[in-house]
């Protein structure tokens, strides 16, 4: 299996969530029994935290309504695009490889004055919003989240709050977010904005990881929030139609008082969902955000893994270490089997193009999703007590989807925790072909746990992931 996983994460969940921690029980080789958690939005945050209190009072009651579409979507595109695509990871002839290419100003300790020269070289004339949306839609993605402003402080939209934006500071003289919003609306793709509310290395008073390195960055953070954050967020929430998601990041210095200034702005978009990175305590938000990792087990809250296709978020010309499409599909399935969403990143070039290796892989993922999307959209975590060694399991109502990554050499697919009676197993890609059961046995460790064995043909229908449907599943 080619998917990325990690030990159980402690990732600072939303105020409404706790990370389930439990010990797996050893069983037969290749089978690990784990208690299946239940999902809820029960308040488990610190009741003395004022940000948590404000969130619960103002947005907690509407959480279930607001996240319904997101739970159905399961798969989205993250876009890290900004003026950092001009140096593309290189500054004064040196590859700045620490962190993603979007961090070049910080990691290269580039002065504000020097960085402000980059927009003059940023003219992404090949940008085509419709093409980008088509790439996402054809890959099976249901929503897009794009960097409206990253930590460098450069706004990728026409902002009246700061001239350091793509419309006023570049020869491009267009608002790509406006064009993207229109293209998304036409294609029925939901659009969200990433906004760096704390770190801002260009505007005085903005925070910086590791501290300021240029006197031009010094200033009052509260004034920065008043003069830059609030007006820009108002612009994003007022001028671009329906905004589905706001994706905050790195809440350095985001005290309860500062959070209290920004939370009311969400009311400009009553249906918007917010991640858990607005405040330093991660006490607010609708969902948790493991980054570049997939939790070993399901979480007790809504969650979304964001991940790159190579080693960087923003475009770095030298980074050609691309994950294969097989890995991307397996990651998507692994995440869905644990009740999460997958936000997969692309880093467009300074010309406005999504790199071809990303496009190629998304086409491959899309081909798989065209046949098997039913096993991802609107599914919930696996109900089985074991993560099978051969793949993953998703569920929708009384239907199970067995995702077979590793085809058994002997043709016998062992499904722990499943007892088939009158249920019929068929291939999702070929519903007319029944998959016969070779019988039901019981675990040698726990006799109450049934193990069904399915007899598979010699070769998989899809070498990446062959999906088998079992309808009429009832929890034992």
Language model: regions and residue ranges:
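Bacterial N-terminal signal peptides that target proteins for export
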Residues: 1-12
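Mature catalytic domains of secreted/periplasmic carbohydrate-active enzymes
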Residues: 27-476
């Amino acid at each position: 299996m080619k998917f990325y996983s990690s030990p159980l994460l402690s990732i600072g969940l939303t105020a409404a969530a706790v990370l389930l921690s439990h010990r797996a029980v050893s069983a037969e080789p290749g089978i690990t029994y784990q208690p299946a958690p239940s999902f809820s939005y029960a308040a488990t945050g610190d009741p003395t935290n004022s940000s948590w209190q404000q969130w619960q009072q103002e947005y907690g009651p509407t959480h279930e309504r607001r996240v319904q579409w997101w739970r159905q979507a399961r798969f989205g595109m993250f876009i890290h695009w900004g003026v950092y695509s001009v140096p593309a990871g290189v500054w004064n002839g040196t590859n700045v490889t620490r962190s993603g290419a979007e961090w070049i100003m910080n990691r290269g300790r580039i002065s504000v004055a020097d960085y402000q020269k980059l927009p003059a070289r940023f003219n992404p004339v090949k940008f085509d919003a419709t093409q980008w949306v088509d790439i996402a839609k054809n890959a099976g993605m249901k929503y897009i989240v794009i960097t409206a402003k990253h930590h460098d402080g450069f706004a990728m939209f026409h902002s009246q709050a700061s001239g350091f934006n793509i419309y006023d500071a570049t020869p491009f003289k267009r608002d790509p977010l406006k064009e993207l919003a229109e293209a998304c609306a036409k294609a029925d793709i939901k659009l969200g904005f990433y906004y760096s509310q704390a770190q801002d290395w260009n505007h005085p008073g903005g925070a910086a990881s590791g501290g300021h390195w240029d006197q031009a960055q010094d200033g009052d953070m509260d004034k920065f929030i008043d003069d830059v954050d609030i007006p820009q967020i108002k612009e994003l929430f007022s001028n671009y139609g329906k905004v589905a998601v706001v994706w905050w990041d790195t809440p350095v210095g985001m005290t309860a008082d500062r959070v209290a200034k920004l939370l009311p702005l969400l009311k400009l978009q009553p249906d918007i969902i917010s991640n858990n990175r607005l405040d330093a305590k991660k006490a607010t938000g609708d969902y948790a955000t493991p980054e570049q990792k997939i939790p070993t087990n399901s979480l007790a809250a809504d969650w979304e893994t964001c991940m790159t296709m190579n080693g960087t978020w923003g475009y770095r010309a030298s980074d050609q270490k691309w994950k294969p499409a097989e890995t991307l599909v397996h990651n998507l399935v692994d995440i869905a089997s644990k009740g999460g969403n997958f936000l997969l990143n692309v880093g467009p070039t300074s010309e406005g193009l999504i790199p071809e290796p990303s496009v190629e892989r998304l086409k491959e993922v899309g081909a798989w999703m065209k046949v098997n999307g039913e096993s991802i959209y609107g599914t919930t975590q696996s109900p089985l007590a074991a993560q099978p060694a051969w793949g993953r399991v998703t569920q929708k109502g009384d239907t199970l989807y067995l995702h077979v990554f590793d085809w058994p050499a002997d043709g016998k697919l062992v499904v722990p925790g499943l007892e088939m009676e009158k249920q019929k197993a068929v291939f999702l890609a070929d519903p007319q072909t029944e998959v016969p059961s070779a019988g039901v046995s019981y675990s040698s460790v726990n006799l109450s746990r049934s193990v069904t064995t399915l007899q598979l043909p010699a070769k998989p229908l899809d070498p990446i992931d062959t999906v088998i449907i079992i309808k009429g599943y009832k929890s034992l």
